[in-house]
Amino acid sequence: IDWLCIPSFDAPSVFASLLDRQAGSFRFAPIGINHPSARAYEPGTNVLVTTWKTPSGWVVVRDALTMGPYPGEDSITPHTRPPTDYDAEHMLVRTVVCIEGQVGIDLVCEPCFDYGRTPAEWTLADGDPHMADASGAGQTFRLRSNLALGIESSRVRGRHKLEPGERAYCALSWAKGLEAPADVEDAEARVAATTRFWRSWIGRARLPDHHFSEAIQRSALAIKGLTYMPTGATVAAPTTSLPETPGGERNWDYRYTWMRDSTFTLQALHGLNLDMEADEFIQFIADLEPTEDGSLQIMYGIDGRRDLTESTRDDLSGYEGARPVRIG
């Protein structure tokens, strides 16, 4: 994982090796293998499935930003929109199963807070070798796994050889109380619940019956992944500073609501009979503080804020050398 901002799209990153190799990453993969054999989303979902082949066997890794039953008031990302039956659990869950042979799995979690500026400080939670807390730049999250964890300076590491049929997991939690799956069964259940959430959502869509249906479904799921449920806003992209052309300077921070882009994306969902997101976005607009002449800005923060002052991070090398890296 090369990019993750928590607890929201526009929060400072904890993993940003997408923009600089030293700015934090999270690996959960076979030891010594850097390139997967296959990678795709579980059909009808935003659960990522990665298949790894090694000289000694095969494993399959699943990654999910998990969804669960609405727990009540959300103190992590406060809602201004009415709640739905499901809501974000504020955790990233990763599971692995050995399909064949024996495969050594490598867990390396090396966050670097505030866009690579602050290395993590780790402690074992309550002395438990299966739970470690990372803190920095005013943020804290918990890593929990059925692998034994060891602290190596600003990173945590775990290794284990999986036998055929054996499963393992790790979970990163920034939820209230740093709640995280207690065992692999719990982790798999949360991924399964997330799968059901996505399939239930896309099941409401009116998809055309032709050879582009799969691509349309995948596009709809991507758009839904760009919506911010607490306010109804949508972002143009979950990333910043990826150039329009290789090595170019047109590399903006798109983690905000651009009025034109959001209109097009929600029009696409409306055409598929997925109207709730469009309704929520209209309410988001209605809640915005107007300008002095009553007009709308071209963009807003996902919480409705108007001031999105831009800064640059000259200490980051940029995506494939594309600079500057822009924030805001």
What are these regions (language model features)?
Residues I1-G328:
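Acidic, mature catalytic/reactive cores of soluble proteins
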